[in-house]
């Protein structure tokens, strides 16, 4: 049965026509918002977090029908299959067991293997943090460079930045991902090779960007005096292909394993998170895992009507497939969460930016929305104008951390006030009549410019404090949201074939850039012309 033929989908279409012009302002009006209030009904705790869904264009019937859609689409069955280690990535014939990386149950899949690798990580991290692991001249490590791309970069970078307040001040962590040499060059300007440890992270250990940077970094060490037989003091590898790591020149004892049953964008909980563990310590890393496990349990045990990942995913479908929203915004009012939007871009769009159903037929409905964002309050001075007064409706996830993780506590009420006021303003708007009063006598022409449509939907996620445990729960919340949406859309969120074609053609173009001549029959005229211009520039 296809999505559009499900009874709940048909019922939602009828319900949408009934509710599409309803005003949030009216639902919140005192005469309508009686106990239990709308905020009380639609604010739901889970996994140590809380979500206020009340400023969304939903009512109790919307939630009932969306939950029925989840049941009809098999969300519970697919969730349980994922946790059980069944094949939920059929195009690659793999399980998706990122949840096993933070499971505490000894009966969880691969528990012994995961525990052993984490213990090895902890031993190494403690040695680096304590100074007992030194560089080739005996100096302690003061800089860690994580080289990886995609899931081997975005997750660890996001977490290390978010948990800066609990990280050791003795070690600076740097992240290099781009094959553009400027990325690595800028980091190398800041570090001393005698005090630097490189973590090379690649599932296959053949990734173009990662291996290009790794080779350049190895050459840099040697050029600055590190003997080749001492590179083992400065290089470790994280991969599902240990043989290739050793072939690169990294000592076998310095190889940490990841597994093919963990997708890259879900892998920060594994040895891919070694840079996190070195920065914050094994105990705090365990807290990060514990928070994710809290959300895993909530996802498995909470009824769908009170289940944060389920509701977050279903409300996203409500806007994407019924209101026709093409993008959605993540606005963390926390500078510590600066990299969360870019992390979620990969998690959401690489997972659910698909057109092929699980049975190989193609969808006739939209899937992943464009995911974007910027921390508050910066975004208010960039794109919030469009959110408030533009013709396009963009659903928003606000994320508010209620207590600061820094000593400048007097800033925090201002930050929270802006977050809450933005959600209120987007919901309320300002009518033309109200705008006329604001404009004042004799300024009637200004009034239309002072109107706000309002009725703009937002969810506010509340985090008491940005502890490692709370951060783990927040990340897992979005991981599971992605699964919920993928299940309803009947797509595979665990592969990423869309990145392959460009990589294949990229090798052809790279060869042509250094060839004596380019066969115009190999490419379209635009690509041929671009190659020729680049060839001329590279020869200068």
UniProtKB/Swiss-Prot annotation:
Record-annotated active site? 350, 381, 503
Cysteines joined through disulfide linkages: none
What Gene3D superfamilies does this protein's entry cite? 1.10.1390.10, Glucose-6-phosphate isomerase like protein, domain 1
Give the Gene Ontology MF terms in alphabetical order. carbohydrate derivative binding; glucose-6-phosphate isomerase activity; monosaccharide binding
Q: Name one GO cellular component term.
A: cytosol
Q: In which pathway does it act?
A: Carbohydrate biosynthesis; gluconeogenesis; Carbohydrate degradation; glycolysis; D-glyceraldehyde 3-phosphate and glycerone phosphate from D-glucose: step 2/4
Which EC number applies? Answer: 5.3.1.9
Pfam short name (any one): PGI
Respond yes or no to whether keyword Phosphoprotein is given for this record: no
Q: Which GO terms describe its biological process?
A: gluconeogenesis; glucose 6-phosphate metabolic process; glycolytic process
Alphabetical list of PROSITE patterns matching this protein? P_GLUCOSE_ISOMERASE_1 (PS00765), P_GLUCOSE_ISOMERASE_2 (PS00174), P_GLUCOSE_ISOMERASE_3 (PS51463)
Write out the entry's keywords from A to Z. Cytoplasm, Gluconeogenesis, Glycolysis, Isomerase
Concerning NCBIfam families, the annotation shows:
PRK00179.1
What the record says about family reads: Belongs to the GPI family.
Give the matching PANTHER family.
Answer: GLUCOSE-6-PHOSPHATE ISOMERASE (PTHR11469:SF1)
Per the entry, what this protein does is: Catalyzes the reversible isomerization of glucose-6-phosphate to fructose-6-phosphate.
* Protein's name in the database: Glucose-6-phosphate isomerase
Q: To which species is this protein native?
A: Burkholderia cenocepacia (strain ATCC BAA-245 / DSM 16553 / LMG 16656 / NCTC 13227 / J2315 / CF5610) (Burkholderia cepacia (strain J2315))
